[in-house]
């Protein structure tokens, strides 16, 4: 089993770590009955409204930028009315963050590090108040 995991590309292992942690800690996960995050619901509504033909800042209003709404609108296309698409965006963002952190740690250490060194910082971030 260990040999099989070590053959997977590093990004795939980081994505798997991100998916497991976010499935447990993010309210966008199907493991939660509903997502009560006010901002996420606003962004999701704005994005779906924008893709539904409404004009931002005239028909619907919030003070964030249109790129954020576009991302959430695309997530709405992937997941319908639930937050599966948003969870996919979160997994992509966390994987990018972990990969960048791992590469930075490798540059500072001067050697190649195991992907699993990122498990503790990833778990700490996913369990923080940012995901509550």
Label the model's feature ranges.
Residues 31-46, 59-74, 81-84:
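Extracytoplasmic catalytic/substrate-binding loops of multi-pass membrane glycan-assembly enzymes
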Residues 16-17, 70, 88, 115-119:
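Hydrophobic alpha-helical transmembrane segments
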Residues 69, 83, 97, 119-132:
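Aromatic- and kink-enriched transmembrane "portal" helix at the membrane-lumen/periplasm boundary
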Residues 60, 64, 75, 85-92, ...:
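Membrane-embedded glycan-lipid processing machinery
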Residues 88-110, 123:
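Transmembrane-helix motifs of polytopic, lipid-linked glycan transferases
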Residues 1-26:
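Start-transfer (signal-anchor) and selected internal transmembrane alpha helices
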